[in-house]
UniProtKB/Swiss-Prot annotation:
Homohexamer. Forms an RuvA(8)-RuvB(12)-Holliday junction (HJ) complex. HJ DNA is sandwiched between 2 RuvA tetramers; dsDNA enters through RuvA and exits via RuvB. An RuvB hexamer assembles on each DNA strand where it exits the tetramer. Each RuvB hexamer is contacted by two RuvA subunits (via domain III) on 2 adjacent RuvB subunits; this complex drives branch migration. In the full resolvosome a probable DNA-RuvA(4)-RuvB(12)-RuvC(2) complex forms which resolves the HJ. The keyword Hydrolase applies. It is an enzyme of class 3 (hydrolase). This is Holliday junction branch migration complex subunit RuvB. DNA binds at R294, R313, R318. Has 3 domains, the large (RuvB-L) and small ATPase (RuvB-S) domains and the C-terminal head (RuvB-H) domain. The head domain binds DNA, while the ATPase domains jointly bind ATP, ADP or are empty depending on the state of the subunit in the translocation cycle. During a single DNA translocation step the structure of each domain remains the same, but their relative positions change. It is found in: Cytoplasm. Residues 258-348 are annotated as: Head domain (RuvB-H). The RuvA-RuvB-RuvC complex processes Holliday junction (HJ) DNA during genetic recombination and DNA repair, while the RuvA-RuvB complex plays an important role in the rescue of blocked DNA replication forks via replication fork reversal (RFR). RuvA specifically binds to HJ cruciform DNA, conferring on it an open structure. The RuvB hexamer acts as an ATP-dependent pump, pulling dsDNA into and through the RuvAB complex. RuvB forms 2 homohexamers on either side of HJ DNA bound by 1 or 2 RuvA tetramers; 4 subunits per hexamer contact DNA at a time. It comes from Nitrosococcus oceani (strain ATCC 19707 / BCRC 17464 / JCM 30415 / NCIMB 11848 / C-107). GO terms for molecular function: ATP binding; ATP hydrolysis activity; four-way junction DNA binding; four-way junction helicase activity. One of its GO terms (biological process) is DNA repair. InterPro entries: AAA+_ATPase, AAA_lid_4, DNA_helicase_Holl-junc_RuvB, P-loop_NTPase, RuvB-like_N, RuvB_C, WH-like_DNA-bd_sf, WH_DNA-bd_sf. Mg(2+) binds at T69.
Length: 348
């Protein structure tokens, strides 16, 4: 990946984990954005706590960087219980999951990131654990092997995924609470940027926070990452204060434009417009054209372009919309303006 793709990638960098942890809100009262999720959890969590019960199992899904891990920490904090954290790829054998489950305290939260990547044999162990609070484990080998049931304490499983469609129906149906995280509105990102600036002890003008928020692709993780790079620029090239002008210059230096697009976003859009005449084009063809992996396009680049209306999915493949043409100052091709898109621009 290029430097600026790293800057606007919603994927978490290993070096960011400690910084991100210090910036995460610990309580629902400090949680910004996702109003529907917040409103629901403000009912479910106190209800479970008042009854001294484990919260129902929670599935959180949405694009990377929107706060799935943060929300899991908040759930544990609000329930005043321990959080045990792991990920789907780490749980290679049923015994790995059994070890975690049998060491939980009553009402603890077990957080499994990338839960769609659980192996089928591990997932089979999870079903009775979620539903009946029991697991079956094998003791011994060969003819002497036998299965025994272990009772588990009440617990809450919080599963997070960017690919909810890859979850099996039996697993998905066992979650009593399902929360979808959406891209953040600019005004919510401004609040997040201002909060982070206060924690980092930065001097920032409102317009500076707005400029960073506008270019953050609706993603808090990207907003915080860009803020730290703007701080570097302000301290070296300015007086340390983040103004709108300072933010603009810093983000232009990082090649992040006013829409939050970086080189790879523009490369993908231009490939659709110039090499494939606006589409429709398959993802594999796009991946080959821009030298990127299919998974990166589907999970990292494409979601924001779809949400912003620059790309649309059709049964025949991806198509560029009129927004994409206008962004590059090109005249939309007639065949590239389907009726449902054309109706949005009656005066053009």
């Amino acid at each position: 990946m290029t430097l600026n793709r790293d800057m606007v990638s919603p994927q978490e960098d290993r070096g960011e984990k400690a910084v991100e942890f210090s910036l995460r809100p610990a309580r629902l009262a400090d949680y910004v954005g996702q109003p529907q999720v917040q409103e629901q959890m403000e009912v479910f969590i106190p209800a479970a706590r008042a009854r001294h019960e484990a919260l129902d199992h929670v599935l959180i899904f949405g694009p990377p960087g929107l706060g799935k891990t943060t929300l899991s920490h908040i759930i544990a904090n609000e329930l005043e219980v321990n959080l045990r954290q792991t990920s789907g790829p780490v749980l290679e054998r049923p015994g790995d999951l059994a070890a975690l489950l049998t060491n939980l305290e009553p009402r603890d939260v077990l957080f499994i990131d990338e839960i769609h990547r659980l192996s089928p044999v591990v997932e089979e162990v999870l079903y009775p654990a979620m539903e009946d609070r029991q697991i079956d484990i094998m003791i011994g080998e060969g003819p002497a092997a036998r299965s025994i049931k272990l009772d588990l304490v009440p617990f809450t499983l919080v599963g997070a995924t960017t690919r909810a469609g890859l979850l099996t129906s039996p697993l998905r149906d066992r979650f009593g609470i399902v929360q979808r995280l959406e891209f953040y509105a600019v005004d919510h990102l401004v609040l997040i940027v201002e909060r982070t600036a206060r924690i980092l002890g930065m001097a920032m003008e409102k317009e500076g926070a707005l400029e960073i928020a506008r270019r953050s692709r609706g993603t808090p993780r990207i907003a915080n990452r860009l803020l730290r790079r703007v701080r570097d620029y302000a301290e070296i090239k300015g007086d340390g204060q983040v103004t709108r002008q300072v933010a603009q210059k810093a983000l232009d230096l990082l090649d992040v434009d006013s829409h939050g697009f970086d080189t790879m976003d523009r490369k993908l859009l231009l490939a659709m417009l110039e090499k494939f005449d606006g589409g429709p084009v398959g993802v594999d063809s796009l991946a080959a054209a821009i030298g990127e992996e299919r998974g990166t396009i589907e999970d990292v680049i494409e979601p924001f372009l779809l949400q912003q209306g620059f790309v649309m999915r059709t049964p025949r493949g991806r198509m560029a919309t009129r927004h994409a043409y206008l962004h590059f100052g090109l005249k939309p091709a007639v065949k590239m303006v389907p009726q449902e898109v054309s109706d949005l621009f009656p005066n053009e």
